[in-house]
């Protein structure tokens, strides 16, 4: 029996910290990747947004130094994409917001051509923070991902938040001992692997036809 081809996993770390600094977000993402490795062969890579050049804009290439085209290639090649962000003042980090804004170019590609680099890919979410906001950030990212065409499985997120008023220097030790976060990481890994395998075995097919939602899309042919 032939061996199973590894699942390609891309973790997008939107921590504001630069390499080689440790981040709670990066370490929780690594825990999820380790849980996935225990379930299936994977080929995993981590892209740290803070060390990339991703200028403001909605185009495919905003400058000669723009790293976005290379990142799009990584996203296209991935079976699973992990969106990993810390919480800043109750919301996702500015780097996660920048990523979402740049992804809009791929969403517009689908609207205008009927082809998508992201539709049907399995996505998961990793969130860390010092006090609160995890569920709010999770919900807002889930809304964006599902409308862009990512497939969100059950238990699609893992998070950890620290205790109100306590020194952030204690966050890492507390997170590493938090059984609930470990349980969420395991559940997230199981869901991602299961649904990525399912979609590889049964790829999503688009029904051929023309969109009728508006004049702009009147001649849009969906791929067969």
Please tell me what each predicted stretch does:
Residues 24, 59-60, 138, 152-153, ...:
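Surface-exposed beta-strand edges and their flanking turn/coil or helix-capping segments
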Residues 16, 130, 159-162, 210:
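Glycine-rich beta-alpha junction loops
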Residues 19-20, 132-133, 163-167:
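A short beta-to-alpha transition loop/helix N-cap that caps and shapes the active-site region
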Residues 1-113, 175, 179-224:
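N-terminal beta1-alpha1-beta2 submodule of the flavodoxin-like/Rossmannoid cofactor-binding fold
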Residues 148-156, 160-161, 167-180:
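Conserved anion/nucleotide-ligand pocket segment
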Residues 114-160:
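Short, glycine-/small-residue-rich phosphate/pyrophosphate-handling segment
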């Amino acid at each position: 029996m032939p061996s199973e081809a590894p699942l390609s996993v891309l973790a997008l770390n939107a921590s504001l910290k630069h390499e080689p600094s440790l981040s709670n977000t990066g370490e929780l993402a690594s825990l999820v990747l380790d849980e996935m490795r225990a379930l299936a062969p994977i080929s995993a890579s981590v892209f740290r947004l803070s060390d990339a050049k991703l200028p403001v804009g909605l185009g495919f290439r905003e400058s000669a130094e723009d790293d976005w085209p290379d990142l799009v290639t990584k996203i296209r090649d991935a079976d699973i994409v992990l969106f990993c962000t810390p919480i800043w003042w109750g919301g996702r980090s500015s780097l996660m917001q920048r990523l979402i804004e740049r992804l809009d170019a791929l969403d517009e590609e689908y609207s205008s051509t009927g082809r998508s680099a992201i539709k049907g890919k399995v996505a998961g979410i990793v969130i860390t923070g010092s006090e609160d906001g995890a569920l709010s950030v999770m919900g807002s990212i889930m809304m964006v991902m599902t409308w862009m065409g990512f497939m969100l499985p059950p238990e699609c997120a893992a998070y950890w938040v620290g205790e109100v008023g306590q020194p952030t220097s204690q966050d890492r030790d507390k997170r590493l001992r938090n059984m609930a976060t470990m349980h969420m990481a395991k559940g997230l890994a199981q869901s991602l692997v299961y649904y990525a395998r399912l979609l590889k075995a049964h790829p999503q097919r688009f029904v051929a036809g023309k969109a009728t939602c508006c004049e702009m899309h009147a001649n849009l042919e969906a791929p067969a």
